[in-house]
């Protein structure tokens, strides 16, 4: 299945139904009171996280989603039916952004989490609502309000504990194949990895972590070179970054310069991301002796001013890979993920009595001269009358 991590869609909540102007007319009640019902509220649009999805491909071609409009009110005090909501399933880790204002509406980071992204319009009022002691035959109603409409940008950000950084052909995909059951493509040419991939690393029977592999970065990626930096967003939720460095590049380049390129591109993308914990791992030590690998790594670290620990591995042969995974697991256990902001559970949608309706009722509350009508019976002064028919 094609990996799609961005999609722009149009969402439209339902409009509110209009109120009804009606009067009770029966065989022996020729001049009954007002009985026009309210309209129904418009349907809402929700996003809901689904752990069974891993791509936004469902929204690649279907671009418009509209909730149902609320029905208009009817006579006999019948309230219009509320419009049906629509719930759009998205992968866990999806972020919703208003494309016009660039406002982030929220992140869906847990299975089943639901988020309101477009609110339906409020219902209009029927003429029964305008009945009073001085307005006994009201012929006023209100219209339903329009529902929210917006262009919504969906961004999928993979939820992983560990993110892999490095130039093309540094051995990131080979590393993931060595430590997990994931099988990303591996070849001897740059940009073999074209889309992000996830692998679950099982350290023991009770501990595991998720590692994310993204396409390699090159110099100028922040300006669009190579595959650009569009995939770096998948590392924003990682707890630690593994910077994989080819200790002996086949093109003869300086590994220290290669590391500086990655650091520069990372900083240009996001200062916050560049400040995440980052571990230095030298790969492909199977191409030389252990003594030569240690000496070369020490020289590279001195050139960079790297004062923290670093690791030597061979992803192809599996050498020193297990100790690295155990240290990563210990770090993850010692540094639990910060609690995600809890989304407030959506309340049950009920009929709203908002200022919109109150203001319109006030406009007609004391219009003695204009609204007086003798088309009423004495029973109408008792308020809203509900008629029950067998």
Curated annotation (Swiss-Prot):
* Record-linked CDD domains: Obg (cd01898)
Q: Which GO terms describe its biological process?
A: ribosome biogenesis
Keyword Cytoplasm part of the UniProt annotation = yes
* Ranges where the OBG-type G domain occurs: 160-333
State a single Pfam family of this protein: MMR_HSR1
Reply yes or no: does the keyword Nucleotide-binding apply. Answer: yes
Where in the cell is the protein located? Cytoplasm
Q: Which UniProt keywords apply?
A: Cytoplasm, GTP-binding, Hydrolase, Magnesium, Metal-binding, Nucleotide-binding
Q: What is its EC number?
A: 3.6.5.-
Acidic residues composition bias: residue spans: 366-382
What PROSITE patterns has UniProt attached to this entry? G_OBG, GTP1_OBG, OBG
Q: Annotated Gene Ontology MF terms?
A: GTP binding; GTPase activity; magnesium ion binding
Question: For binding Mg(2+), which residues are annotated in this chain's numbering?
Answer: 173, 193
Q: Where does GTP bind?
A: 166-173, 191-195, 213-216, 283-286, 314-316
User: Which coenzyme or cofactor does it need?
Assistant: Mg(2+)
Where is region (Disordered) located? 363-382
Query: Per the record, what is one GO cellular component?
Result: cytoplasm
Q: Which residues form the Obg domain?
A: 1-159
Functional summary from the UniProt entry: An essential GTPase which binds GTP, GDP and possibly (p)ppGpp with moderate affinity, with high nucleotide exchange rates and a fairly low GTP hydrolysis rate. Plays a role in control of the cell cycle, stress response, ribosome biogenesis and in those bacteria that undergo differentiation, in morphogenesis control.
The record's family statement is:
Belongs to the TRAFAC class OBG-HflX-like GTPase superfamily. OBG GTPase family.
User: What is its quaternary makeup?
Assistant: Monomer.
Q: Which HAMAP family match?
A: GTPase_Obg (MF_01454)
Under which name does UniProt file this protein? GTPase Obg
């Amino acid at each position: 299945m094609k990996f799609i991590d961005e999609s722009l869609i149009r969402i439209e909540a339902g409009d509110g139904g209009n109120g009804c102007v009606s009067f009770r007319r029966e065989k022996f009640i020729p001049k009954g009171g007002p009985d026009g019902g309210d309209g129904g509220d418009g349907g809402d649009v929700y996003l809901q996280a689904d752990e069974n999805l891993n791509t936004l491909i469902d929204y690649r071609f279907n671009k418009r989603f509209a909730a149902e409009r609320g029905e208009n009110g009817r006579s006999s005090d019948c309230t219009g039916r509320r419009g049906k909501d629509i719930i759009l399933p998205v992968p866990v880790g999806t972020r919703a952004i208003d494309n016009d204002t660039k406002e982030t509406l929220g992140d869906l980071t847990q299975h089943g989490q639901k988020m309101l992204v477009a609110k339906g319009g409020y219902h209009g009022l029927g003429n029964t609502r305008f009945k009073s002691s001085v307005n006994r035959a009201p012929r006023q109603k209100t219209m339903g309000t329009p529902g929210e409409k917006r262009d919504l940008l969906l961004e999928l950000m993979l939820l992983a504990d560990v993110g892999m950084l490095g130039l093309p052909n540094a051995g990131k995909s080979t590393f993931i194949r060595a430590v997990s059951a994931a099988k990303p493509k591996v070849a001897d040419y740059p940009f073999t990895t074209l889309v992000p991939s996830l692998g679950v690393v099982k350290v023991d029977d009770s501990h595991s972590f998720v590692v994310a592999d993204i396409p390699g970065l090159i110099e100028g990626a922040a300006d669009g070179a190579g595959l650009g930096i569009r995939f770096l967003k998948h590392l924003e939720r990682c707890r630690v970054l593994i910077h994989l460095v080819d200790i002996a590049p086949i093109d003869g380049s300086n590994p220290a310069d290669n590391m500086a390129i990655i650091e520069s591109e990372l900083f240009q993308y996001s200062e916050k991301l560049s400040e995440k914990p980052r571990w230095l791992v030298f790969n492909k030590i199977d191409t030389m002796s252990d003594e030569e690998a240690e000496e070369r790594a020490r020289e590279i670290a001195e050139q960079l001013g790297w004062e923290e620990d670093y690791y030597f591995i061979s992803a192809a042969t599996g050498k020193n890979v297990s100790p690295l995974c155990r240290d990563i697991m210990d770090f993850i256990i010692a540094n639990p993920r910060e609690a995600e902001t809890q989304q407030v559970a959506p309340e049950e949608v009920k009929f709203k009595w908002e200022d919109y309706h109150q203001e319109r009722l006030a406009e007609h509350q004391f219009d003695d001269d204009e609204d007086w009508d003798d088309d009423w019976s004495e029973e109408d002064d008792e308020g809203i009358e509900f008629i029950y028919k067998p």
